[in-house]
């Protein structure tokens, strides 16, 4: 699995971006959001149980990610048509404010090293900086949903470019190593 310091792979995927007729799909690639932070997360498959809770939670925080100049991008190995059908079918996904990318050939999940032995994407999330370098990566067991608020907290910490202690949140003091070494 790619990790901190690795370049995020190049990709080009079709995404479901809307339920509005004629506006449903867009092509998204590694340059689409160039110069922005990116929150890229994968889920195993559509029409399941844990996945929509995470996707909806990332959607509810989308504005907060956008306020930090970060674009949320989600994907699975399902096609854009399956994503569209799921969005249409699931109340919590209808108005999703970010693209649901279709990695139907499994190229991105393979390049990231998150394709499971079962052929499905592992439940992974990556924070990618403006230079397309991975600054955070996490994967959980398929039965355990991620916490998008924690991903937002880590993004905040990364954007300070300072030392942030355990459980640090935006607005709190960061660590001053000079003062700490001086015993202050």
Segments from the language model and where they lie:
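Chalcogenol-based redox active-site neighborhoods
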Residues: 1-184
């Amino acid at each position: 699995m790619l990790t901190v310091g690795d370049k995020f792979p190049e990709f080009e995927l079709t995404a479901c971006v809307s339920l509005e007729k004629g506006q449903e799909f867009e092509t998204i690639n590694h340059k689409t959001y160039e110069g922005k932070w990116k929150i890229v997360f994968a889920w195993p498959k559509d029409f399941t149980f844990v996945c929509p809770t995470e996707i909806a939670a990332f959607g509810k925080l989308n504005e907060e990610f956008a306020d930090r100049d970060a674009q949320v991008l989600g994907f699975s190995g399902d096609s854009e048509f399956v994503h569209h059908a799921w969005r249409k079918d699931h109340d919590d996904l209808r108005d999703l404010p970010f693209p649901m990318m279709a990695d139907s050939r499994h190229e991105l999940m393979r390049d990231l090293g998150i394709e499971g032995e079962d052929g499905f994407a592992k439940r992974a999330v990556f924070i990618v900086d403006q230079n397309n370098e991975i600054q955070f990566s996490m994967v959980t067991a398929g039965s355990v949903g991620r916490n998008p608020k924690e991903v937002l907290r880590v993004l905040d910490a990364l954007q300070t470019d300072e030392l942030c202690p355990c459980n640090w949140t935006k607005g709190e003091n960061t660590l001053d190593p000079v003062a700490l070494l001086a015993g202050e």
